[in-house]
Amino acid sequence: MISGAPSKDSLLPDNRHAADYQQLRERLIQELNLTPQQLHDESNLIQAGLDSIRLMRWLHWFRKNGYRLTLRELYAAPTLAAWNQLMLSRSPENAEEETLPDESSWPNMTESTPFPLTPVQHAYLTGRMPGQTLGGVGCHLYQEFEGHCLTASQLEQAITTLLQRHPMLHIAFRPDGQQVWLPQPYWNGVTVHDLRHNDAESRQAYLDALRQRLSHRLLRVEIGETFDFQLTLLPDNRHRLHVNIDLLIMDASSFTLFFDELNALLAGESLSAIDTRYDFRSYLLHQQKINQPLRDDARAYWLAKASTLPPAPVLPLVCEPATLREVRNTRRRMIVPATRWHAFSNRAGEYGVTPTMALATCFSAVLARWGGLTRLLLNITLFDRQPLHPAVGAMLADFTNILLLDTACDGDTVSNLARKNQLTFTEDWEHRHWSGVELLRELKRQQRYPHGAPVVFTSNLGRSLYSSRAESPLGEPEWGISQTPQVWIDHLAFEHHGEVWLQWDSNDALFPPALVETLFDAYCQLINQLCDDESAWQKPFADMMPASQRAIRERVNATGAPIPEGLLHEGIFRIALQQPQALAVTDMRYQWNYHELTDYARRCAGRLVECGVQPGDNVAITMSKGAGQLVAVLAVLLAGAVYVPVSLDQPAARREKIYADASVRLVLICQHDASAGSDDIPVLAWQQAIEAEPIVNPVVRAPTQPAYIIYTSGSTGTPKGVVISHRGALNTCCDINTRYQVGPHDRVLALSALHFDLSVYDIFGVLRAGGALVMVMENQRRDPHAWCELIQRHQVTLWNSVPALFDMLLTWCEGFADATPENLRAVMLSGDWIGLDLPARYRAFRPQGQFIAMGGATEASIWSNACEIHDVPAHWRSIPYGFPLTNQRYRVVDERGRDCPDWVSGELWIGGIGVAEGYFNDSLRSEQQFLTLPDERWYRTGDLGCYWPDGTIEFLGRRDKQVKVGGYRIELGEIESALSQLAGVKQATVLAIGEKEKTLAAYVVPQSEAFCVTDHRNPALPKAWHTLAGTLPCCAISPEISAEQVADFLQHRLLKLKPGHTAGADPIPLMNSLAIQPRWQAVVERWLAFLVTQRRLKPAAEGYQVCAGEEREDEHPHFSGHDLTLSQILRGARNELSLLNDAQWSPESLAFNHPASAPYIQELATICQQLAQRLQRPVRLLEVGTRTGRAAESLLAQLNAGQIEYVGLEQSQEMLLSARQRLASWPGARLSPWNADTLAAHAHSGDIIWLNNALHRLLPEDPGLLATLQQLAVPGALLYVMEFRQLTPSALLSTLLLTNGQPEALLHNSADWAALFSAAAFNCQHSDEVAGLQRFLVQCPDRQVRRDPRQLQAALAGRLPGWMVPQRIVFLDALPLTANGKIDYQALKRRHTPKAENQAEADLPQGDIEKQVAALWQQLLSTGNVTRETDFFQQGGDSLLATRLTGQLHQAGYEAQLSDLFNHPRLADFAATLRKIDVPVEQPFVHSPEERYQPFALTDVQQAYLVGRQPGFTLGGVGSHFFVEFEIADLDLTRLETVWNRLIARHDMLRAVVLDGQQQVLEQTPPWVIPTHTLHTPEEALRVREKLAHQVLNPEVWPVFDLQVGYVDGMPARLWLCLDNLLLDGLSMQILLAELEHGYRYPQQLLPPLPVTFRDYLQQPSLQSPNPDSLAWWQAQLDDIPPAPALPLRCLPQEVETPRFARLNGALDSTRWHRLKKRAADAHLTPSAVLLSVWSTVLSAWSAQPEFTLNLTLFDRRPLHPQINQILGDFTSLMLLSWHPGESWLHSAQSLQQRLSQNLNHRDVSAIRVMRQLAQRQNVPAVPMPVVFTSALGFEQDNFLARRNLLKPVWGISQTPQVWLDHQVYESEGELRFNWDFVAALFPAGQVERQFEQYCALLNRMAEDESSWQLPLAALVPPVKHAGQCAERPPRVCPEHSQPHIAADESTVSLICDAFREVVGESVTPAENFFEAGATSLNLVQLHVLLQRHEFSTLTLLDLFTHPSPVALADYLAGVATVEKTKRPRPVRRRQRRI
């Protein structure tokens, strides 16, 4: 202040006001650059140049001076006179002092103290993460400046100055969501690119590449890299400056300051000093304190307003933003010259509108026009720099806030719209203190704004963005770009040298081509129009649709042509004269030529006339499908009447309603249809009618008169009749015949019902052309097998149906290799969505066939558009409508009747001569749907569509309550009307749910107990639950953390109270000294009171004086770091909610660690065990409020899968995610969100409801919770409730902060709880308490009433046809309403999102078969309630689970084929394929404990493993070996050794050896002492690994495993585990590792002994021999099995001495894996089939022949015992699977899956046996199949080799004899993980690595790009040239192969036969194959040993496999002997082949 001047407080009010007004006037003159004479009291300040930003600054000035004005008031009257009146009306007495706050009040940034982000900064930081939608970019500006003479040293010096001046340039952004100041900023100086001497071409290329690299740069803000300057030096002293700035550190308003200061420094000027005592951290703390009350008000304001907000801009997209992997933005710029801008802003000011709001209104209007909206939610950027301190004005920081503005875009003049928006803005701006970021988060939580508000408007008018200087040393801004995460289009307006720059930065990849360009052009035209035409402000916005688009519409709709003459039926009678003997129609009963058909029709017409039918009468046809329908139709038309087809398949009452509405004169029926008659209307059977005399003179009608009336569903409950003229229908039929050359050679399969208008073309189109109808009977309408027979028998050439039926045909034919579709030359589909896959699938049968997609409406004569499809482009999202048919037209219209621009969705209108006459006898509905405009008569379809730029029409679905379901058009209103008439329905509404294939869902509010059934308690549930509990286990009652330890922590660590110190009765000074925020006062007072009780402080009356005492040293380890956490919370630097995630201090952890928690959980486990025995099934336990699942994990660890099915329900999505991760390894655990849909899905299912410290927390939020729990429980269920009676000391340091210091208000004693239970009709049977933790056993009521949807469906079926009865019925207490009281349909639809779809109440399985299937699906798929609509594969099923399912169904007495499940994956459809069979009396599982330690036979696979490891075999000399290396921190070797020995004792096969060709379990083995290695370097560890990884374990000596440990200096311990597949298969290894992990983690929890052994399993009679049918099936396949992949090899396999395996491994992250499985399910493929097909695609590209066979490893455990999946053993079987490439990848994959399902049906025949048969068939020694696929998917071991385990996998390898390449796949931690183990020496260097890269790339592509599934294989992986198997090297010829044939003597043959009998125990004839005679591979090993003893010393094991019969072997031995005698060469090392 000036010395001597009076302070404001000393001025009298009048003088005070006068001084303020004078200051206002002077500052306005200066700011607006006016003279005093130019500024009048009535001058419009906005017109004078006052913009939005300056207005906000003036508002701050007014408030700082004590005038409580609002922004709305300043905008309302922007003149000095009006503002003066406002000042006079407000008292200025409460003006704020201009004094600076105390420096210590607002702390500065320091290196050690991070501080919070603003909401916008937080959004930027999280949004930039790569996993976020449109993430992977920062909020980033890249700008180039072009100038002269700037040097790097000048620039660097200036930036260094700014670094010292602005602390925000030192900021780094931490992963925990905070920012921190770095004393040394991250800046490496200016990077210089010297291009002064480059030629022009290379210089430009360099600059382009530099721009490409820098323009979308993601700066490393986490280390403080927030800006960067690079300088390019150019010739002639020119330069280009490249600037990168992350907007986390500065907003656009700070740019001006930044560049101004930088330019000043470069110009040699000095900068004024700034106040360093107050920085951005100070500002944020200051702002938080001042704004807190305003923030609460603002939050309430926005939450109240939220439900009324309009949608965000709805622009056409080509892809979902979440699928876009990279963000690359494009800039568009319009520069408005100063003079034109002056005109624009001046005119805006005249209407009291700022230029900013005028621009925002124009921008919104363009968005609205292309989004079909009248209002939208615009994301407006605010530069919300509050002048809290003088230092703020010169501060560089991000002050950004966002405001979501409800913007009016249409329906008024431009000026009025802008004023309305400005008024809304001023009101919203006053409530900006609850940021738009937070509002958006709330809106997303409500699932209303899935993309947020992705279109942003930013205005920086009134200042330059880059510098306010006229001359800038930096240069002029030229090319630039910005990015903001999650933003689609970002609009920026700013001034530059008097001009205004309007820029759009957009992510064009999201939008259709040229769309953004079109929008920007429209925006520029609006701005130019408002600049040029003053009157435009007083008019609505001019239409923005481009003229070029209108011209294209006119062209494609120019369809006029001559109109066909005559009546609809006349052409058929002309054909009858021309070709009377030609076939006209055939069905199962009749086959008529044209003469017969027309004769019958004439006779029937004659009888109609006799019955009194007059011209124009309506005659109903109600009969089942057949040739008689044609007679009836033609007869009615000949009689001059109108035919009215009325379906027989609907309730009689509805038929009668149609008859009455249509004034039907007579009903034509079929005499076989007993129920077709009418009570009130005459009926006539066509069979009787054709006995009459034919009509003599057919009645002639005008072509414009009606031909037929088709009734469709009506919204009022009454069906509506569409009246179609002869001319309209005839035009369509003739057009289609001409377009597709339909003629006498054609036959059509007439599938459509007569009341479906596709039948009109079948009859009048095909017969008019001389073709014939092949009619299906009523029972064949859904039977593709019958269709194929009819198509083949009658040579059908045309197909005309809804898409679903054609899909059914293709699926059938693909599955059964039926080539029937090749007969169809033309396929016409319409009536519903057409799958993108259908054209290619059809052309796989007939490449040159015509595939025609058509559309239209019954109201427009069958069809109105057609599109012939050749190839389906990858970018298509659906099959389009195409173009209008002849004499027909289309419009796409918005709500105001305007044509929609290209790509914009609107209602489809149809015009032309096909438009119906209207609805019969319903003028009101006719007027609503049929519009007569000056140009044309139009039918409003209610369909949504859009135009493409070339004039193609795309169909997008329905907009009203009329839907298409299964091809039927249904008015939802008719269903709602029928529902409302049912007794017991209070209110109801109906929706069609699903994206394309719709399903009807009814939401019903029932009355009283309507549609109810009563359930009673299961007698197996106990009446007294405490009888199951037993005695509560003993426990220590001392808490983990004592009160004394808590007191120590509070006194010394947190409050820092020293002995003798007096805190004072008022805690505020203490809080101030510790910088504790005022809101924590209640908490601090509670702590002080606690310290008094602990005798650490004296009472408050004595000032809380600290008592004498010393700090204890035995601090609990959980306190480590907790003081820092609490200090940050108390100071406001951290949110207290972070405690919820604290591993030690969350309320959940504190409750879990309470000493009574473990005994209670153990008691609950005991109850579950006892109850499971009583129920003879797993107990269904639902935990409500599961949190992160800590207690659940402890419970599940004490139970097995046969005892519990656990469902955890949790409100918090974050905690739900944590719980899913924690419980991922428990197959019986499922987790769901706590919401209405989940509750409905689990209704009446829980045997036990568990509430662990949750009831007190949930009850206040939901007072009806106890009633809800009743709905979850079965009658008589147990509520197991655990609740604290009082707060524990440790909770003072956690829970207290989360409950506002008053947690006890939520806690109750046992009497209070018992009263609550009793009031809710529960019976509290028992209670207990230990150390303050209470436990209640509460019984639910024994009787419960529930709603039964089937009752309602049955009632509806009496009023509606079957296709109109909703498949889903959802009972609700009330329908949800919007803010304006209407039904909230969006809320209802959200119940059926894909996530909620599985949880919604739906059509329950019906009948015993469906229920049996449903029960098995629930068990196998680990899912909740399945419905009749549930799809096995979409629910997670795969081929493995499918195989298990068929086996279990067989045990239940049903014949089930895998192929049926693949073809019919919907539950109801699959159940219909099952056939009841007589199952032999099931043999009980034989357990032979007395034979447990006796030898038993090896399986075929075990024998192959054993024989194959012999050193002489090709690729032998290795074991079937699995090796894995783990690292483990803080290894407890004793514990590990104990656990391993327990597992040895538990599992017999860990004690097994192989002796004399048999396996045997040892009864006793010595304790395993784990060998240890002390190692000093990682290299030593690697040497140990290498030695162990490739060892061959001796199966004859125990142990046949190896487990060793290595200690490496400074590293975690290493654990090496070797297992042999000879004794353990892959699943056994998963079980073993899971039990090892669990045992080591929980050593006190012992696993129970197993009641069954592997030996028992193998001895079961059902496993002893393969099914004869399977043997025959494989025998029939032998000639069609191709060889193994012919891959390029480095050498022949037999040349590899000892194979050495190498590994490649990879993974598909959980997101992509989930997406890939979802795509697989949608394509009805299992995940394994997809992976096999991807792998085969790669192999096929490298193989010499594209077809080949793979060897599949199956872990084939037959479900012979409930605990079969807990035992170890080698259950492996092998199965061959062939790959045959098809037209596309998808087709190939589907074919592979079809073969897979067939092969699995016959998997009881091993691949080993099949390969032997192949060898015999091909007369070769062996047919190897050395390329192996091993899938462990579906085994629910998500913890297998998981990195989260204590045993963390580091490295692994497997090896198998005779295998070249083994691809293994498994799931772990939500990911797909896979390995390739291969013989390294076998393949050229780098080849397998290249194949692996291709596989990984293709796998990712399949997950990301759905269109790639349709591509040919060569487009995915190009074939490799010269791929072949050692093609350049001739095979070696061994001497034995070239020896002469010498016959053996009979004695040798006899000797071999005798030896065989001795070894095998069976006889063999001389010429009989050893294997066919009963030998195994192991027998041949034994035979080899025996024959060597008989003087055949040169005989090798391979010789027996090469010459596998006595005579062949004897012949060979004779030849060898001869050669030995004559040549006596040096012995040749024999090469062995794989068996």
Swiss-Prot record:
Consists of a central region with similarity to the repeat domains of ACVS and GRC2, flanked by two repeat domains, each of which contains 5 direct repeats. SUPFAM superfamilies: Acetyl-CoA synthetase-like, ACP-like, CoA-dependent acyltransferases, S-adenosyl-L-methionine-dependent methyltransferases. Residues 3-547 are annotated as: I. GO terms for cellular component: cytoplasm. Its cofactor is pantetheine 4'-phosphate. The modification O-(pantetheine 4'-phosphoryl)serine is found at S52, S1439, S1977. The lineage of its organism: Bacteria, Pseudomonadati, Pseudomonadota, Gammaproteobacteria, Enterobacterales. Belongs to the ATP-dependent AMP-binding enzyme family. CDD domains: A_NRPS_TlmIV_like (cd12114), AdoMet_MTases (cd02440), Cyc_NRPS (cd19535). Unknown. May be involved in the nonribosomal synthesis of small peptides. One of its GO terms (biological process) is amino acid activation for nonribosomal peptide biosynthetic process. Binds 3 phosphopantetheines covalently. Residues 1466-1919 are annotated as: II. I-DR repeats lie at residues 114-146, 310-321, 378-390, 454-462, 477-491. One of its GO terms (molecular function) is ligase activity. II-DR repeats lie at residues 1495-1527, 1682-1693, 1750-1762, 1826-1834, 1849-1863. Signal peptide: none annotated. Residues 15-91, 1404-1478, 1943-2017 form the Carrier domain. This is High-molecular-weight protein 2. Keywords: Ligase, Multifunctional enzyme, Phosphopantetheine, Phosphoprotein, Repeat. InterPro entries: AA_adenyl_dom, ACP-like_sf, AMP-bd_C_sf, AMP-binding_CS, AMP-dep_synth/lig_dom, ANL_N_sf, CAT-like_dom_sf, Condensatn.
